[in-house]
Design a protein with these regions (language model features):
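Histidine-centered catalytic micro-motifs
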Residues: 117, 137-151, 203-209, 371, ...
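Divalent metal-coordination and catalytic microenvironments
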Residues: 63, 102, 115, 145, ...
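Active-site-adjacent substrate-binding region
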Residues: 247-276, 322, 326-383
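Acidic/His- and Gly-rich active-site-bordering loop/insert found
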Residues: 35-141, 150-153, 161-166
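Acidic/histidine-rich catalytic neighborhood of metal-dependent amide-processing enzymes
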Residues: 147-220
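C-terminal motif of bacterial Sec signal peptides marking the signal peptidase cleavage site
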Residues: 28-30
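Midchain, well-structured core segments that form catalytic/ion-binding scaffolds
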Residues: 198-331
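His/Asp/Glu-rich mid-to-C-terminal helical/loop segments that flank catalytic regions of hydrolases
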Residues: 240-251, 255, 381-423
Length: 423
């Protein structure tokens, strides 16, 4: 369902007045006709965020208490829509399923900058050791998507307070079905960006670092995932052929577990064979997924596997194989990342940004699909609280994300968005 209102998409009259009065005060006696600096805009936005921080924490706790799995984010999308509509955003709903796209216009001729937040929860029965634990059987927020969504709403509060002084346009993309690996593609297929593609897109992902720390890597940061399907048929020895195929595929694997845990700085291939089948009609199949990363990794991966399989031959049997890209890798635009880091250092100096040690091979993220269409950067956002002894390792049974990460994420992303609006 699409929801449009011609009065939305620009801040309300009261909110514009509040924002302009705040910005006038920030000018500290300067000429009223001078446009505010982005530092002043950031300060105004964060003042507004500080005023609603308890509301944002309560919003996050509510999402955590009532998680929704991929493709079923009805309540979550409704809460997001309600919040952003009140803030004066133009809101589209039902994008790619239960996706929500909210746009705010300051300078209509300024750059369009997007921020993406995923909304869905993880299936399973985790411990969830927090006072606001999940009340939904079989669903828990143990990947931080409740934090991501709340950061998106926090950004909306901050930027709405700036009013017409916003030097561009912002698009907040609340994505469904990330855990299924399909949400980004579904939104892209449903014209998530409408008629105007953003100039840049940003995102954060919860990570096991202390609150106040963020981490990022230029170019390839998170592994992509490709499905490989090998089929043999005929009247030969199917069992022997399957074993040889499995062995050939595993020889194409370039990383062992020790290397995976240590991270990789070069392109790598990690193969997980998850399926094997044969039937009475003389057919057999070996299936698996290939996780890989690095610049231009896809041709490298395919060629390595093709070479391994093409060396095989079986008496009385024919072999066919195919590849299907399941998830794009997260590939951060290097120049955009450098500028974003500088913006965080200048406007949000309490946030520490460090390099990720190398490509993260153990996890995938479909944010890379958006990056295929729009240049962008994803940051890893620290959610640990060492004093409380809580650790937020995604998908772990004792996952806990500290509420303090909300303000950190909002602070950093508002800085990045405002800076990106400067031509």
């Amino acid at each position: 369902m699409l929801r449009r209102d011609t009065n939305r998409g620009r801040p309300s009259r009261c909110r514009r007045l509040y924002g302009l009065l705040s910005l006038t005060a920030l000018a500290l006696g300067g000429c009223a006709s001078e446009p505010p600096t982005i530092d002043e805009l950031h300060a105004t936005a964060m003042q507004s965020v500080g005023a609603v921080e308890p509301t944002l924490v309560a919003f996050r706790h509510d999402l955590h208490r009532y998680p929704e799995l991929a493709g079923a984010e009805v309540r979550t999308a409704g809460k997001v829509t309600e919040s952003l509509t009140k803030l004066g955003f133009d809101v589209r709903t039902g994008v790619g399923g239960h996706g929500v796209v909210a746009t705010l216009v300051g300078d209509p001729d300024g750059p369009l900058i997007a921020f993406r937040a995923d909304m869905d929860a993880v299936a399973g029965d985790a411990l969830d050791p927090v006072p606001y634990a999940s009340e939904v059987d079989g669903a828990h927020h143990i990947c931080g998507h409740d934090i991501h969504t709340t950061i998106g709403v926090g950004i909306a509060h901050g930027l709405a307070s700036i009013g017409d002084a916003l030097p561009g346009r912002v698009m907040l993309v609340f994505q469904p079905s990330e855990e299924a690996g399909t949400g980004a593609e579904l939104m892209l297929d449903d014209a998530v960006f409408g008629n105007t593609k953003p100039d840049a897109i940003f995102a954060v992902h919860a990570a096991p670092f202390p609150v106040g720390q963020m981490a990022v890597l230029p170019d390839g940061m998170m592994a992509g995932r490709m499905l490989v399907d090998v089929r043999v048929s005929g009247e030969g020895d199917l069992g022997s052929a399957v074993n040889e195929i499995r062995e050939a595929l595993m020889q194409a694997d370039t990383v062992g577990m020790e290397q995976i845990l240590a991270f990789q700085t070069e392109p790598f291939i990690s193969i997980n064979l998850f399926g094997q089948a044969d039937d009475s009609d003389g057919n057999a199949a070996v299936r698996g997924f290939v996780m890989s990363a690095g610049l231009d990794y896809r041709p490298y991966v395919e060629q390595r596997i093709r070479s391994a399989l093409d060396d095989l031959s079986f008496d009385g049997l024919q072999m066919q194989y195919s590849f299907k890209q399941a998830l794009e890798g997260v590939n951060n635009d290097a120049a955009m990342l450098s500028r974003a880091n500088a913006a965080i250092a200048a406007m949000a100096p309490s946030v520490s940004v460090s390099p990720v040690p190398g490509v993260i091979p153990a996890f995938s993220e479909d944010f890379g699909s958006f990056q295929r269409s729009v240049p962008g950067v994803m940051y890893m956002l620290g959610i640990d609280n060492p004093q409380a002894g809580t650790v937020g390792f995604p998908h772990s049974p004792d996952f806990v994300a500290d509420d303090g990460a909300i303000r950190v994420g909002v602070d950093a992303m508002i800085a990045v968005i405002l800076d990106a609006m400067q031509r």
